[in-house]
C-alpha cells in the first residue's frame, strides 16, 4: 500500500492557511509557513510551494522556497518579519501574482504583491497594494488575502479588512505597476 502525506501539516513543514489553485495540469498549494516549536504564527521567513498532478493528487511534490521576507523592502534585520497567509492569481498577461500580508515588529503592516513567470518559481517583489489616491493601503490589519481573476478583473478580498478590487492591476500602461487600488465598497463588501 502506498503511503500518502498531507502537505499542509507534514512532519517537517507546517503550511497552514492553505490556498489550493489549479494552474495547467497541476494543483498548487500556497500558505503560511509556521516554525516547529514556534511561539507565534508565521515565524518562518519565507513561503514554500507544493504541487501535485491533477490526475494523482496524492503525489505531492515539495517545490522549495518561492519567496523570502528579505525580498520585501520593509524587511528589518533582527525584527519579526512575518509573512501572513498568501494567495496567488494568474493575470491575463500569463504571470503569477503572489499577494501577501507582511507585518511584525518591523512596524510594517500592509498587503504587498510579488510576481513570477511560473506558479512556484522565484517571486520578485512588485509593490504595495494602494488606495485610489496612491497611498499605501494599511488602514486595517492586513491578512489572509484571496484573489481571483474575474474575466480580466483581478479581485482582491482579505480578512480583517474591507474588500478590494484590483481592476487592471497587472496590465501594462495601467498607470500603476505597484499593486492595486482599493475600490469603494458598501458595508456588505460589494462594489
Predicted regions and their residues:
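Carbohydrate-active catalytic/glycan-binding domains of CAZyme proteins
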Residues: 1-191
Amino acid at each position: 500500500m502506498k503511503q500518502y502525506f498531507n502537505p499542509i501539516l507534514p512532519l517537517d513543514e507546517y503550511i497552514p492557511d492553505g490556498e489550493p489553485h489549479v494552474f495547467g495540469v497541476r494543483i498548487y498549494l500556497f500558505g503560511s509557513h509556521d516554525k516547529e516549536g514556534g511561539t507565534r504564527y508565521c515565524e518562518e521567513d519565507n513561503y514554500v510551494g507544493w504541487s501535485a498532478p491533477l490526475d494523482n493528487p496524492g503525489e505531492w511534490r515539495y517545490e522549495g522556497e518561492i519567496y523570502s521576507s528579505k525580498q520585501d523592502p520593509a524587511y528589518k534585520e533582527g525584527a519579526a518579519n512575518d509573512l501572513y497567509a498568501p494567495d496567488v492569481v494568474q493575470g491575463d498577461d500569463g504571470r503569477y501574482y503572489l499577494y501577501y500580508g507582511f507585518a511584525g515588529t518591523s512596524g510594517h503592516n500592509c498587503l504587498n504583491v510579488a510576481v513570477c513567470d511560473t506558479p512556484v518559481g522565484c517571486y520578485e517583489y512588485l509593490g504595495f497594494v494602494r488606495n485610489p489616491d496612491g497611498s499605501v493601503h494599511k488602514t486595517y490589519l492586513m491578512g489572509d488575502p484571496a484573489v481571483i481573476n474575474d474575466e480580466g478583473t483581478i479581485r482582491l478580498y482579505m480578512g480583517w479588512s474591507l474588500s478590494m478590487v484590483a481592476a487592471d492591476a497587472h496590465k501594462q500602461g495601467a498607470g500603476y505597476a505597484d499593486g492595486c487600488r482599493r475600490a469603494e465598497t458598501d458595508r456588505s463588501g460589494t462594489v
